[in-house]
Amino acid sequence: MDIWKIIYTTESGYEDEIKVSAINKFMAWDIFEDIVKDFDEKVISADCFRVVDS
């Protein structure tokens, strides 16, 4: 499994990032969708990147 970093912005302008462990980008998005269900605000944008160890 890889580590995926998702950077997101809410409708009030709050920006943050979370890291999830997933097999691929599609699974990472699915995990993120489950997490944002508990947010008080709507997420208006998000980007997903695979974390690479150097």
Q: Could you describe each region identified by the protein language model?
A:
Residues 33-54:
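Short, mixed-charge low-complexity intrinsically disordered segments
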Residues 14-25:
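A short, exposed loop/beta-hairpin motif centered on an aromatic-Gly-Thr core
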Residues 1-16:
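Short aromatic-glycine-(Arg/Gly/Cys) micro-motifs in beta-strand/loop hairpins
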